[in-house]
Curated annotation (Swiss-Prot):
This is Chromosomal replication initiator protein DnaA. Its main location: cytoplasm. Belongs to the DnaA family. Oligomerizes as a right-handed, spiral filament on DNA at oriC. Residues 334-454 are annotated as: Domain IV, binds dsDNA. Plays an essential role in the initiation and regulation of chromosomal replication. ATP-DnaA binds to the origin of replication (oriC) to initiate formation of the DNA replication initiation complex once per cell cycle. Binds the DnaA box (a 9 base pair repeat at the origin) and separates the double-stranded (ds)DNA. Forms a right-handed helical filament on oriC DNA; dsDNA binds to the exterior of the filament while single-stranded (ss)DNA is stabiized in the filament's interior. PROSITE patterns: DNAA. Residues 74-116 are annotated as: Domain II.
Amino acid sequence: MFDLEKFWDSFNAEMRSEFNEVSYNAWFKNTKPVSFNKDTHELVISVQTPVAKGYWEQNISANLIQSAYAYAGIDIYPVFVVKNGPTPSSERMLEPQPQAKPEKARPQGREFTKDLRLNEKYTFENFIQGEGNKLAAGAALAVADNPGTFYNPLFIFGGVGLGKTHLMQAIGHQMLAERPDAKVVYIQSETFVNDFINSIKNKTQDKFREKYRTADLLLVDDIQFFAKKEGIQEEFFHTFETLYNDQKQIVMTSDRLPTEIPDLSERLVSRFAWGLQVEITPPDLETRIAILRKKAESEGLEIDESTLDYVASQVDTNIRELEGALVKVQAQATIQKQDINIGLARSALADLKLVQKSRGLQISKIQEVVANYFQTSVPDLKGKKRVRQIVIPRQIAMYLSRELTDASLPKIGQEFGGKDHTTVMHACDKIARQIKTDTEIKSAVSDLRQMLER
């Protein structure tokens, strides 16, 4: 029998040993189990805010699933619900609140930000939210509203051209709008590297440290370029420590998680996990249409919805390429002196690799083949039934989707009835283990792989 109260006490004790006190209080103190369904194994958990919900789904859910399996030998399905309460902008999220420290003396006005290079278009007002970025956007708004308190550091990761820099700079714009004398430092990681090297050559290390360690908000883009640079990592570690201890906000972006950056020191990996690590994934069709609509409005273009829909359906990789496709359509319309319509868009984008032709193996195909192999149905694979004859095929289908396509974990979860990415991760890990110990599972996976790779 699964004793929810005892399990929760055990899980909390485990997490308390893995998180520092500030992080533990932030993520666990006000999070409570609500109910456990013994038939579906659904565990409902109450969290304080939408961002906390996203953090649990992305960062803690896998630990919760593994702990439940170790505790009771069962697979649970966590469901996170937001408790009614104040929004992040009005609540005081940490208990106890850190005591304000005296401000270090510094010149007033814009002296510190005169060299800042923020793109004036990268504001929250211009950011289009969708399923792939709503958690990151919510976290960025919370950080802009309460810098240095809760999601510190904020680590945004994802592919090229998905809006990481936009969100990061939006935080900077909002801080400067509210505090014109704030010291906001925005840099590419390569700039930090070059500044550090030059400070050694010119013996100006004190000036270098003054620049970075007295910031109110430090924004570091593409931090993966710190990979394999031990001296740079050492310097950034001390910069991080100084800012964090002074309760100053740190925001970083990367194309991957800290744990996936080659030779990134363990202490940096650990500190980057103190706050919130949040992924941005490629926009879905609805979001892509909204992005194009916003772009068309800003450029004064008259484009009907069907044409926007067509252009959006041709590019599903990133926002940069999506907007590039619209620019190409606009250019052809200008050259040919024609109105923009589907026919013109089709002609302008004819040399693009249409997404339908470039995706390769589809998750839907994997689901169909797996369902036929196990004599079940695709709706069952996407559903919530917990009987073994459906659970195992579902987990194998998720595993093969991960192995044979380039779909992200959240994307795979979406294709399996909207399951969160930690459920997919658990399924993939479980099948990977069983392949080594269970000849029946190994044989089934091998058969299916051969069928799908023909």
